[in-house]
């Protein structure tokens, strides 16, 4: 697509309607280096999904190691951050790697607005021609969401080397034995989930 209008036209009809609705609101787009609001939103999103979050120092380290190739795009409503995504840029590609939204994001359509704004920004200001929406397991919720955008999927294979284990552990959140943990984690106060999450996250792969 050559411009913002072309990008919007390339998106599937139903998803395009959500973006157009968001474009009529008071949502604003901000390119940032300060990761405070991003981490607050991302860690809350993971808590709400029942997943431990990694330490904020990982984002600090990524920004320090790749200062020219990372960027945060945050969507705000009346100054308050409602959605935010941490992105990598590589050889004409933008990769929205870590993203999330406040609970109100669903009502505001701010996540949809955010990814569209990222596409436009990456095209206009970063000379990107490819939007890599990342890997998702077939028929998962994330896969369905990306499919609604009209993304072209490419089959990728996972490879594992077992060191001591005789078989691969099922770490999928769909594994029934994790359901109780997920439900308990969703009920944790944010401060506790942000403190305890990094202590557990590195065990989850």
Give the predicted meaning of each segment:
Residues 10-14, 57, 97, 109, ...:
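Surface-exposed loop/turn and secondary-structure junction residues enriched for glycine/proline
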Residues 1, 17, 51, 62, ...:
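Generic detector of bulky aromatic hydrophobic side chains
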Residues 38, 54, 66, 86-90, ...:
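Phenylalanine-focused residue identity feature
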Residues 1-107, 120-122:
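A conserved beta-strand-loop-helix scaffold within acyl/acetyltransferase catalytic domains
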Residues 26, 30, 57-64, 115, ...:
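A sequence-level detector of short, solvent-exposed, charge-rich linear segments
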Residues 1-5, 131-205:
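Active-site/acyl-donor-binding loops of N-acyltransferases
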Residues 30-35, 63-68, 108-111, 122-125, ...:
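Low-complexity, flexible helical/coil segments
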Residues 91-155:
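Acyl-donor binding region in acyl/amide transferases
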């Amino acid at each position: 697509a050559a411009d913002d209008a072309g990008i919007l036209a390339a998106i599937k009809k139903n998803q395009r309607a959500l973006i157009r609705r968001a474009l009529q609101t008071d949502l604003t787009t901000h390119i940032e280096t300060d990761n405070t609001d991003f981490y607050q939103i991302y860690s809350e999103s993971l808590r709400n999904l029942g997943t431990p979050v990694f330490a904020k120092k990982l984002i600090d380290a990524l920004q320090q190691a790749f200062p020219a190739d990372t960027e945060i795009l945050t969507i705000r409503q009346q100054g308050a951050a409602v959605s935010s995504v941490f992105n990598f840029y590589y050889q004409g590609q933008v990769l929205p790697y870590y993203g999330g939204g406040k609970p109100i994001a669903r009502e505001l359509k701010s996540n949809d607005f955010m990814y569209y704004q990222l596409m436009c920004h990456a095209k206009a200001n970063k000379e990107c021609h490819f939007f890599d929406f990342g890997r998702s397991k077939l028929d998962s919720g994330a896969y369905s969401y990306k499919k609604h955008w009209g993304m072209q999927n490419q089959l990728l294979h996972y490879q594992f080397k077992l060191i001591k284990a005789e078989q691969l552990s099922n770490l999928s959140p769909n594994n029934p034995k994790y359901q109780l943990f997920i439900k308990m984690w969703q009920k944790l106060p944010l401060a506790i989930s942000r403190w305890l999450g990094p202590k557990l996250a590195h065990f989850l792969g």
